[in-house]
């Protein structure tokens, strides 16, 4: 039976305010009962000065009052331990509600939320484990920051999915959980950046052409053609392999593999939606060429999917690699959001691939990702998400959109200034598709627009054709995020690269300092020095010049 009840609570902002007020009352009681000391108060204020909502941060952090404040690892660990059961409760609420809902899109949104809560809980548990077992090394410091940033992204994504088509009852059911979890995720990030500042040597050295997080074996694989790779599993439509479909192959991949599992997909068009779940780790999906091995689907928001669930291929198992494959969503521009590839796997490499769709083509959802030597086509927001992601040597190709639409290559989704996420486009080429080029004066295209308040995107050392409007960037909604975003351009070329007519927003920057540009390179934005080298993909750690 479809659930359709009147509003039980006020709208989201009202709910958010009530939670904050309630937490403040509790925190005041805690301070009185524990004899809150001046040093504790000072540290709490220092931490919460880093948060976008100081009052809610102070309320949250009062939970760990009385601990040895000098033991920074234990303070953050204790706070995260108190967060875990709350994430579990949100998971149970979403999962239980999904069983009682008849509306397919609402059910999908709730199942998305359940998956996202499960992923968040795993990351929080992993973070607690690091804090419990070891002093922070350069690598574990990087991991913690990336994972805690991803937890916040998961919570926001759940809320976004509910906004796409859920009833007020379903939104109300989940909002109280999600608003608190978002506040907690922001607070954990504030604790982290205050108590564990990045060390000056946080970027590990690069050996040879590869960051150290890419194993020697993976380096060899990424430099090898698919036909020359010795696979563990072969998928072939003609029956000559181990399986005829990708989904059969995914089911056969061992869970939580410590070694690389290679799945070779032979030439053919595979019409299926494929999900590499959290336990499908260290998978390498390799085809026989981006024009020969094609995985295609057509899920879309208009026909009842959520943006998150519309992906033709989704991967959330860490260490995912894809090479020599085309990922496609054929829904068309009239179907609006329709994702070809969604990645929520840490330390992902996408090499020599083609990714084709229209709106929301590629969804680098969260964590560290690297894309090299690939073609991506789309219309509106066709690279969107909140990963720490670098694109190198890629072709980014706006295509002909529907009348009344404007092409935007990026829509970056950073929601908190303490998240270490952002999109970097380096040494790429931006030009119109064959169908757009004759009419590009009629259909405008831009480098990006700010999806979320702290959106962060840099285009550097790239070729920009005249397909890009002289303004360069587009507003999302009037003056939303124009002061808090960070959009930058550095040493680009081509007829569309001139900056004299660019937007005059406070958050837009023409970068002249190499030191600033370096922050958006492989070595710094995605800590490539600690993991990319082992994958074998070619990359440039710093600036090209």
Swiss-Prot record:
Record bears the keyword Calcium: no
GO molecular function: enzyme inhibitor activity; pectinesterase activity
Record family assignment: In the N-terminal section; belongs to the PMEI family. In the C-terminal section; belongs to the pectinesterase family.
Organism: Ficus pumila var. awkeotsang (Jelly fig)
Protein's UniProt name: Pectinesterase/pectinesterase inhibitor
NCBIfam families the UniProt entry points to: PME_inhib (TIGR01614)
GO cellular component: extracellular region
Residues binding substrate, per UniProt: 307, 337, 449, 451
Reaction equations catalysed: [(1->4)-alpha-D-galacturonosyl methyl ester](n) + n H2O = [(1->4)-alpha-D-galacturonosyl](n) + n methanol + n H(+)
Post-translational modification remark: N-glycosylated.
Positions of the propeptide removed during maturation: 38-228
Enzyme class name: hydrolase
GO biological process, any: pectin catabolic process
Keyword list, A-Z: Aspartyl esterase, Cell wall, Cell wall biogenesis/degradation, Disulfide bond, Glycoprotein, Hydrolase, Secreted, Signal
Transition state stabilizer (site feature) positions: 359
Chain's role: Acts in the modification of cell walls via demethylesterification of cell wall pectin.
Region of interest called Pectinesterase inhibitor, as start-end residue ranges on this chain: 38-191
